[in-house]
Amino acid sequence: MTFDVNFRAGEYLVEAGKWEVPHLMEHVLLGANELIPRSRDFQAELEKNGAYSNANTSVYDITYEIECADFEWDRVLGLLLVAITKPLFLDEEFAAEFGNVQEEMAARSNNHFRRLSLEMRRALGLIAKTDSERLELMANVTVDDVRQHYIRTHFAPNMRFVIAGNLPASRRASINKLLEAIDLPKKGRRLALPIERPKRLNRPVYVANDTVENLYFYIDTFIKRRLSEAETDALSLINTILTETLYSKIFGTARERGLVYGMNSGLSYTRSASNWWFGAQVSDKNARALLKITVDELHKVFSGDITDDEIKVTKQYALGRFQRSAQTVGGTAAGYAGRYFFDGEIENYYRVPERIRAITKRQIVEVARAMFADNIWGFGTLGNCGEVFAEQLREDIASLWST
């Protein structure tokens, strides 16, 4: 069984100087509580039959996750609910987790893709701070800040959950009873997502790092609205065609020419905008060639240069990937949680194959063009290539927004 419990309680809800409050709260909450008043003892009881627990904090949310064997679902769920509803937030455990979070932030700061992504996000007008900034701000946070943030955010209407596993009627009834009786305040409503308005960057984001031999880059483009379900499906399919396999149009071509080891792209959303991004780590000498392939293949999409066979083959790939994702309880839970925790929409999982089959070439071309039509975009690099070369790379891709 998998239990994911989510609260709209992320960093956007605290003042900038107190940025690390939600993250520290998440670390301390799955610890000492009224039932078991010591963190190590609580974790020992929770995990004694092999259960796994974790939690994560983002700009928007905090999610608590537990996965356990089927035979102990009720015991483990009970412990999770006690941790969420009866935390003690002890001074000594806060001090210990303060040190652990410092170590976590220091480790994260070595992830160059993450560093560039955060610098890009902030430059584009979205809510973000780098890990090094977060480390500096940690000293502003007290255990009282954590307690107050818990009170402001952990109330029943602000909670969402996804539970996956063997769920016969009797078990569903028991779970419903537990959740309906949860000992959290019942007044209020789900906290709203922040309003973020991405903006066009007129120069590249350049993060100098002389220790990096290759350069890391990201391309971000935005449309000033949320995509429809059909548009999202179509954009996901062309994203697969372009970068997600070793035979894809951009990544596959670049690999065939020996230009890059790996490349990624994907979709993301804010409350009122949609984002399509591309990123890779590549040597300076191959960077312009890789970006030329990217630009050329995207222009082909804009002009409708996609064959029916390419679409058919990619649909088959997408169908298989979907089925594979639903083969575990964790995969099934993740399939529901992404959208539900973000905007409250419960997707009909059984319709996904039908949606994939319904994607048309016209939809693909239209949504790909639309993602570049608002001329809101940015380009960023991390490495030691220099600002002049970074600007040259930006100029190499600028034609994508003049179609």
Residue ranges of predicted features:
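Short amphipathic
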Residues: 201-209
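Active/ligand-binding-proximal structured segments within catalytic/core domains
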Residues: 1-46, 219, 229-242, 250-256
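Charge-rich, well-structured scaffold segments of protease-associated domains
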Residues: 32, 40-190, 196-197, 206, ...
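Catalytic core of Fe(II)/2-oxoglutarate
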Residues: 247
